[in-house]
Amino acid sequence: MTHPPLHLRSSNVLLVIAGGIFGTLARFGLESAIPTLHGWPLPTLVINLAGAFLLGVLLEALLRRGADQGVRRTIRLAVGTGFMGAFTTYSTLATEAVQLGASNQLGGAVVYAVLSLLGGVLASTAGIWAASIHHRRTSARRTGARAAAEANR
């Protein structure tokens, strides 16, 4: 008996849906808590930049812990694809940029779009960097602790 491809397995689809529900709720909560700034869609900008950073952290941390299988795959699907996919909202970014342009704020629309897209790349890169640094530090501590334990034998 052959198994369906990973993206068609009901358990994986349910992980993404469950994560997506919580990501949507988190986005809604932050959108409600963060005010717009003189008509500027600050909530979406903050959410997308935070999501890009956190996705970079998550994927780098998972990658450094091993192959994409078992618990790591479950976390990636539920948190990375589901939660972060629903939490970030580039369709809203596009809609808000068009709305800014339509309300005679063309410069603001361009700045918003560029800041969001370039900022997203920089935020995800910063997340990857932060997770990488954390991994190196914790690995060095573990290695040092093992060496100290062996020296005390």
Which residues fall in each region the model found?
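Membrane-interface helix-loop junctions in multi-pass transporters/channels
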Residues: 1-153
